[in-house]
Amino acid sequence: MMVAHTAQQLDLREKLLTNGVHSLSDIELLAIFISSGNNRKSCLQLAYELTKHLGNLRNILNADLQSFKSIHGLGEVRYAQLQAAKEICHRSDFIDLQKEIRLSNTQQTYAFLKKRLRDYKNETFAALFLDNQHRIIAYEELFSGTINTATVYPRPIVERVLQLNAAALILAHNHPSGLSDASQQDLAITERIRDALDLVDARLLDHIVIGDNEVYSIFAENKWVCN
């Protein structure tokens, strides 16, 4: 049985190398990632069961450990590898964003923030710190809360701005509900942070709310916040 499983795995790798990665189905890609099965299941069978259980690649990438381990034959090692692969992709996206001489590509910025934040199950508050030429210094996730809210304090943000010698920043947070509209609480904390940054001569460029399929720019939709 193990010989057959190994041959199946080699066939998938040969298909990838011969025809390109785009020739593989989602299940086949997962099978290559899983790499090896066990005495009862091949890597392809494990990939099929995982996809059937969780639905699609996005759900698999964002699954918690217990959901992942519910498939017999998959454990902590494969889960850790999956999370590492996911983070590698995130960091690659950040490198692409940093290549901008100045952060002027709004859609690219939105896409990066959306990919980073939209799948979190709890509300997470992040910031892009920029220099005086609007070049990226750092991306950091600063606060995390419950499914409905994250408690955000201006002081740690200002302290981080000073530590990084940042001149400007873009804030972003997700709504786990999937809705991207800003709440009154979102508008209020935006004003508080903007005013706190003014005291240290740093500029808040925008606050982006990330929904499931859309993003909402508080500054674009509420011009009075910019003043």
From Swiss-Prot:
Coiled-coil segments: none
Domain MPN, chain residue ranges per copy: 102-225
Any Gene Ontology biological process: proteolysis
Binding site for Zn(2+): 173, 175, 186
Motif (JAMM motif): 173-186
InterPro entries cross-referenced by the UniProt entry: MPN (IPR037518), RadC_JAB (IPR025657), RuvA_2-like (IPR010994), UPF0758 (IPR001405), UPF0758_CS (IPR020891), UPF0758_N (IPR046778)
PROSITE patterns: MPN, UPF0758
Keywords from the UniProt entry: Hydrolase, Metal-binding, Metalloprotease, Protease, Zinc
GO MF term list: metal ion binding; metallopeptidase activity
Record keyword Zinc present: yes
UniProt similarity note: Belongs to the UPF0758 family.
Protein name: UPF0758 protein lpp2553
Species whose genome carries this gene: Legionella pneumophila (strain Paris)
Lineage: Bacteria, Pseudomonadati, Pseudomonadota, Gammaproteobacteria, Legionellales
